Amino acid sequence: MATLTTARRLVVKIGSALLVDRNTGDLRADWLHSLAADVAWLKGLGLDVILVSSGSIALGRGVLGLPRTALPLEQSQAAAAVGQIRLARAYEEALAPHRITTAQVLVTLEDSEDRRRYLNSRATLETLLGLGAVPIVNENDTVATDEIRYGDNDRLAAQIAVTVGADQLILLSDVDGFYTGNPSDDPGATRFDVIDRITPEIVAMAGDAGSGLSKGGMKTKLMAAQMATAGGCAMAITEGSPLNPLKTLENGANCTWFTATLDPQAARKRWIAAMKPRGDITVDAGAARALEGGKSLLPAGVASVTGDFGRGDPVAILGPDGRRLGQGLCRYTGDEARAIRGRQSSDIEATLGYPGRAALIHRDDMAL
């Protein structure tokens, strides 16, 4: 069974029922500060940590005097707009005593469908982690109408985990794992300790285990598990209401682990390799050797570019003899790539009229 301290990069999803008192609508400050202590402990061990947090609507509705029942879409968006400020400030205040810098990142599931936005969000998160910050990710509830209606922070957390190549995703929830049935309705329901494969029988067991404040249920958690494990990320569902929930999990709290068969990097390369290329980039002999040595593809090593493709689109990488070396996600459009081919990275801004990334295709976005 996995342990948190063996992870390199960890994504933790926090449900709104954990952050907000269901009776008063107030923030559970003591719980949040205990979570912050856990994050500091993990970072002290060398882990990268990203938090994906619900709670903006739950916090905002109390400030606006809205009922704690289902809200019309416009009121949900208004509550999110008010609550998001308070949510970000609460995390900043909780982590500041540990000398941890926080960053707010608002995304939607649609950001993963547009490859240009996907690459941009990935680069931003990687930069924040490299600088030692803890990104606090939330879906942009003020504009993401589908996400508000259906509650997708579980899947959003899985998408973030896959995007950044995390090896573990922890869903802190109001249930302590995945059961054979809904334990509130079925006293005979039993909890799985480990699920190695999500079978049709497992899917059929997923019932709605949501709360009055959380909008996600067990079905969305199972969808998150499918997405995460396919991307090489193991996932755990555990009950998160105790203080210091991550240390509690590390010390043996009840949970269900969904195992991943591939490591994140291998899963990502398989995903890239399976895409249909939108163009070809032919490299010179020096660049071909550099790629084989694990380097990124720089404009200086590009001999020719064919095809009409956009930023983030997959392209085939060909050697000087026309042999296919692999493929990757290009950080420039076809026209931009043609303009900067053969040039030094330092000349990109002068050539295009605006600054760009040094690599045409980063090694992390390449499958050879």
Swiss-Prot record:
GO BP terms, alphabetized: L-proline biosynthetic process
Top-level class of the enzyme under EC nomenclature: transferase
Pathway: Amino-acid biosynthesis; L-proline biosynthesis; L-glutamate 5-semialdehyde from L-glutamate: step 1/2
GO terms assigned for molecular function: ATP binding; glutamate 5-kinase activity; RNA binding
Residues involved in ATP binding: 13, 173-174
PUA domain boundaries: 278-355
Ranges that cross the membrane: none
Pfam families: AA_kinase, PUA
Top-level taxon of origin: Bacteria
Keywords: Amino-acid biosynthesis, ATP-binding, Cytoplasm, Kinase, Nucleotide-binding, Proline biosynthesis, Transferase
PROSITE patterns: GLUTAMATE_5_KINASE, PUA
Reaction(s) the record says it catalyses: L-glutamate + ATP = L-glutamyl 5-phosphate + ADP
Entry annotated with the keyword Transferase: yes
EC number, UniProt record: 2.7.2.11
GO CC term, one of those recorded: cytosol
Main location: cytoplasm
Subcellular location: Cytoplasm
SUPFAM superfamilies xref list: Carbamate kinase-like, PUA domain-like
Ligand binding (substrate): 54, 141, 153
Entries under SMART domains matching the protein: PUA (SM00359)
InterPro entries associated with the record: AceGlu_kinase-like_sf (IPR036393), Asp/Glu/Uridylate_kinase (IPR001048), G5K_ProB (IPR041739), Glu/AcGlu_kinase (IPR001057), Glu_5kinase (IPR011529), Glu_5kinase/COase_Synthase (IPR005715), Glutamate_5-kinase_CS (IPR019797), PUA (IPR002478)
Similarity comment: Belongs to the glutamate 5-kinase family.
Chain's role: Catalyzes the transfer of a phosphate group to glutamate to form L-glutamate 5-phosphate.
PANTHER family named in the record: GLUTAMATE 5-KINASE, ISOPENTENYL PHOSPHATE KINASE
HAMAP family hit by this protein: ProB (MF_00456)
Protein name: Glutamate 5-kinase
Organism, as annotated: Ruegeria pomeroyi (strain ATCC 700808 / DSM 15171 / DSS-3) (Silicibacter pomeroyi)
